[in-house]
Amino acid sequence: MKTLSLFLVLVCLLGLVQSWEWPWNRKPTKYPIPSPNPRDKWCRLNLGPAWGGRC
């Protein structure tokens, strides 16, 4: 049981690392990107209006 939970945690961490870009791998943009709206983030996660995902 312990090994299974550890495996699940490892899989989750690997998924996060895969989706996260290293800052030095990003191509520099000419225009500064505005800070993302937290509501926009929930909107992208498709959690619906109840979670502040009003698009």
From Swiss-Prot:
The modification Hydroxyproline is found at P28, P32, P34, P38. The keyword Metal-binding does not apply. Residues 1-19 form the signal peptide. InterPro entries: Sex_peptide (IPR012608). GO terms for molecular function: hormone activity. Keywords: Behavior, Disulfide bond, Hydroxylation, Secreted, Signal. GO terms for cellular component: extracellular region. It is found in: Secreted. It holds the Pfam family Sex_peptide. GO terms for biological process: regulation of female receptivity, post-mating. Disulfide bonds join C43-C55. Main cells of the accessory glands of males (paragonial gland). Coiled coil: none annotated. Represses female sexual receptivity and stimulates oviposition. This is Accessory gland-specific peptide 70A. It comes from Drosophila simulans. The gene is Acp70A.
